[in-house]
Amino acid sequence: SSDLFGALAAVRDAEDDAVLAAVRAERERQAAAQLTLPAIAGKLDVYKILRFVRSEAFRRICGAEDVLRELAFITSLPAAEVIAAQGRALPDGPAADAGVLVQGIADIVLVYPDHLELLDYKTDRRKTPADFVRAYRAQLELYAKAIEKRFAPRRVTYKGIYSLELGELIEV
């Protein structure tokens, strides 16, 4: 939630114990306010959150002019762009110009005065950064195109995946 981001931003430069205490306090606050189910709150790995606070992804979030979370979009893109983003061969003829509906929810769009950045969280247990790039490159390419269309003339200049399992930001 945005309250968690605020709590983390307030202590991001603090010692690890202070960050962990803030995460635990926010977890308890959300459970008490019934914003999070107690069973889910109990499974929150505070050490993975600490690793996130120390990450490049969190530095980028804190440095943005605006942070758009769970940005839903639906747009039409030329079939040629959709096929190219998937790494497939482009068709010839009118099919390449046909519109394809692209719909999704971007985890985080970072807004800067002259550009945008796209961050996606992944919880799956892939082994290497290359595994994540292979699995999600097409998704992030299409999301970036859709977001650029919505926020023109600003361009998406960075696409990244934050792997909770690996604890790192992976550029796509």
Q: Over which residues does each language-model region extend?
A:
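Structural signature of nuclease core domains in nucleic-acid processing machines
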Residues: 2-172
